[in-house]
Amino acid sequence: MDSLFLEGLEVPCRVGCSDPERATPQSLRVAVRLFCPGLRYAGIADDLERTVDYRLAGELIDAVQGREYLLIERVAEVLAEVALKNPLVDHVTISVRKRPPVQGLEWAGVEITRGREPAGDLQRA
């Protein structure tokens, strides 16, 4: 399936397991891949109405900017929910990276893929 991608989004928010880690906003690096079944037709017809507008990047930033989270996993879930509100997006892959408070480790991150199907019963393992 064809996809659009948004890479290098910098999203400031407070995220981390400890209070000191969340004391100041961190710049998260976000990459988004939007899987859109109609993308081919947008390209053939040169029709903006059949594709996802890049303004979605601003919506993604606004969804988490300035908020506080314990986990980057939650940040990724929130971003996926926002992306899937667009009816042209079938599923989405979100990658979120942050600089961890661990010496010698440049980045820590998570990547998730979510679709329109219901999540079902989310029981703890």
Question: Locations of the language-model features?
Answer:
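N-terminal, polar/charged subdomain of small-to-medium soluble alpha/beta proteins
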Residues: 1-125
